[in-house]
Amino acid sequence: MYKIYIGFDSSNYGQQIAWEVCERSILRNCSDVSQIEIIKLEKKKLIDQGLFKRTDNDGATEFTYTRFFVPYLNNYKGHAIFVDSDFLWECDILDLFKIYTNPNSAVSCVKHAYTNCNGKKKMDGQAQEWYPKKNWSSLMIFNCEHPNVVKNLTLKAANTKTPKWLHRMEWCQEEEILEIPKDYNYLVDYYDEGDIKALHYTDGGPWHPGYENVTYGDRWLKYISEDEKKKIKWSIENEYN
């Protein structure tokens, strides 16, 4: 059974439905859903369980740090995927497990190299700023059994290490980061047209103010009902500052 952890943000209806759409798109395109288990990665649940103890509140979403709890939650066994909730899958996610993993790699991800983000806004309204390995951690296949994951990405480390150390994957060696083609983490409005396998609305999706007509937003909207569209409209008008 392959486990897929989708980051969950409870801050408003739009963020919550984004999680639902991500899950729906994975299930719709998966060749064998009996092989996968999708897990809602909730910060509140981790807090209630006494696992999440970070006190810094500088994350853009509730899953800014929870993603690094995945190896622990997976009992340091096998491979597990973490993905941001603002993804829309258009391929069989099982391919990632079958093609882009190996025993020598600690983690697999798309190694984005773009720098044209300055001046744009994050989904929470904060300014987008470039930094090394930006967006690499938005989709990760953890090799939960890898020695450096077991040794370095402990529960204590997930709770105490700096954002830089965590997101820049300083918990493993550079040669232990296996590259996935960018089509699996296609950054909307940053990349040219390609063989898109998973859309990532990194600046904002149709559930965000100002992004109602975002590129490829029509594909995302196909996954929701008319009633959900009305609720998103209400959320955009009432739940964002």
Where are these regions (language model features)?
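A glycosyltransferase accessory/donor-loop signature
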Residues: Y2-Q16, E20-V21, E37-K45, L139-N241
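Active-site-proximal specificity loops/subdomain of glycosyltransferases
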Residues: Q35-L73
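Short, acidic, metal-binding catalytic loop of nucleotide-sugar glycosyltransferases
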Residues: S25-V33
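Short, surface-exposed amphipathic charged segments that create phosphate/polyanion-binding patches used
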Residues: L51-D58, K121-A127, G194-I196
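Conserved catalytic core of nucleotide-sugar-dependent glycosyltransferases
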Residues: I99-K164
